[in-house]
């Protein structure tokens, strides 16, 4: 599932290329996504001038002169540029044909993605208004985390995946951040010691920064006009590595289900 680093990489790759372009046509091939596409989408979008592409948590905001298209990539979604002559595939559900030689294409094999148009402030949309701070911004600090977690008797992993607490952290990077911080994912949020607040905040910022930088170094692949083969290769320390040796101590990485999600941890390094 694309999380904050993958979404930020798309923003950095695609945003500068579409800024200043006008939507001259749309091709809608499937309307039944997580939220059904409005039948008047073509009328709303044709003629719109794109002014910026922003990100909020895991959402992409394609800001136009008259409103904003809100994208969520779901489990398998991708937003990328293709050449105007590029044939569409089975799972390419929306094309925004731009003036010039490119199409902004949304593909989503499992159809859990979201495409919504709003002519109001997108940050006040029901999908976004309750989001907590961005994890890479100064507002997300050790003192902030303490205020949000010290009375919560839920596993710390579930807390940091709550977008109302902090925006954009999904299962993959929650696993990676807790491993870097040396904190067991099942630890009750209320039981975390104050010194661990700083460790965890620093770990989250570090893991996400490393992943974004890995994506930025591979950003050219999003601009070739060819169908992408997947997201950038970021070398995970622990996610998806059940039974393999811990990169810190060599003991076997374990997996459990926590909040219905696969959770990977080292029983020796994470306490």
Curated annotation (Swiss-Prot):
Please give the InterPro entries that the UniProt record associates with this protein. DNA_glyclase/AP_lyase_DNA-bd, DNA_glyclase_Znf_dom_DNA_BS, Formamido-pyr_DNA_Glyclase, FPG_cat, MutM-like_N-ter, Ribosomal_uS13-like_H2TH, Znf_DNA_glyclase/AP_lyase, Znf_FPG/IleRS
Cofactors per UniProt? Zn(2+)
Write down the CDD domains for this protein, in alphabetical order. EcFpg-like_N
Q: Name one GO biological process term.
A: base-excision repair
* The keyword Repressor appears for this protein: no
Its transmembrane ranges are none
Q: Where is the active site?
A: 2 (schiff-base intermediate with dna), 3 (proton donor), 58 (proton donor), 261 (proton donor)
Zinc fingers, FPG-type, are found at 237-271
GO MF terms here are: 8-oxo-7,8-dihydroguanine DNA N-glycosylase activity; class I DNA-(apurinic or apyrimidinic site) endonuclease activity; damaged DNA binding; zinc ion binding
Q: What is its EC number?
A: 3.2.2.23, 4.2.99.18
Catalyzed reactions: Hydrolysis of DNA containing ring-opened 7-methylguanine residues, releasing 2,6-diamino-4-hydroxy-5-(N-methyl)formamidopyrimidine; 2'-deoxyribonucleotide-(2'-deoxyribose 5'-phosphate)-2'-deoxyribonucleotide-DNA = a 3'-end 2'-deoxyribonucleotide-(2,3-dehydro-2,3-deoxyribose 5'-phosphate)-DNA + a 5'-end 5'-phospho-2'-deoxyribonucleoside-DNA + H(+)
The entry marks the following residues as binding DNA, namely: 91, 110, 152
Keywords per UniProt: DNA damage, DNA repair, DNA-binding, Glycosidase, Hydrolase, Lyase, Metal-binding, Multifunctional enzyme, Zinc, Zinc-finger
Cofactor: bound how, per the entry note? Binds 1 zinc ion per subunit.
Under the heading Pfam families, the entry gives: Fapy_DNA_glyco, H2TH, zf-FPG_IleRS
In terms of NCBIfam families, this protein maps to: fpg, PRK01103.1
Its biological purpose: Involved in base excision repair of DNA damaged by oxidation or by mutagenic agents. Acts as a DNA glycosylase that recognizes and removes damaged bases. Has a preference for oxidized purines, such as 7,8-dihydro-8-oxoguanine (8-oxoG). Has AP (apurinic/apyrimidinic) lyase activity and introduces nicks in the DNA strand. Cleaves the DNA backbone by beta-delta elimination to generate a single-strand break at the site of the removed base with both 3'- and 5'-phosphates.
Q: What family does the database annotate?
A: Belongs to the FPG family.
Subunit structure as annotated in this protein's UniProt entry: Monomer.
Give the protein's recorded name. Formamidopyrimidine-DNA glycosylase
Query: Gene name?
Result: mutM
């Amino acid at each position: 599932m694309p999380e904050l680093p993958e979404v930020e990489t798309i923003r950095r790759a695609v945003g500068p290329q579409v800024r200043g372009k006008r939507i001259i046509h749309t091709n809608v091939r499937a309307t039944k996504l997580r939220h059904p596409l409005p039948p008047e989408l073509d009328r709303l979008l044709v003629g719109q001038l794109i002014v910026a592409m922003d990100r909020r948590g895991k959402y992409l905001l394609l800001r136009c002169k008259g409103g904003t298209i809100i994208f969520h990539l779901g489990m398998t979604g991708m937003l990328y540029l293709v050449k105007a002559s590029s044939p569409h595939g089975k799972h390419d559900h929306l094309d925004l044909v731009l003036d010039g030689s490119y199409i902004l294409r949304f593909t989503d094999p499992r159809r859990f993605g979201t495409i919504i148009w709003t002519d109001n402030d997108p940050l006040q949309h029901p999908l976004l208004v309750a989001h907590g701070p961005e994890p890479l911004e100064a507002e997300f600090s050790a003192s902030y985390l303490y205020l949000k977690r010290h009375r919560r008797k839920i596993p710390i992993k579930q807390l940091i995946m709550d977008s109302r607490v902090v925006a954009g952290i999904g299962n993959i990077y929650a696993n990676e951040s807790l491993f870097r911080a040396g904190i067991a994912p099942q630890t009750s949020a209320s039981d975390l010691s104050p010194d661990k607040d700083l460790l965890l905040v620093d770990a989250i910022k570090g893991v996400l920064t490393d992943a974004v930088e890995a994506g930025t170094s591979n950003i050219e692949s999003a601009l070739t006009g060819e169908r992408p083969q997947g997201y950038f290769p970021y070398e995970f320390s622990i996610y998806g590595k059940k039974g393999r040796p811990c990169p810190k101590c060599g003991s076997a990485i374990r997996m459990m289900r926590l909040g219905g999600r696969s959770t990977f941890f080292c029983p020796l390094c994470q306490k």
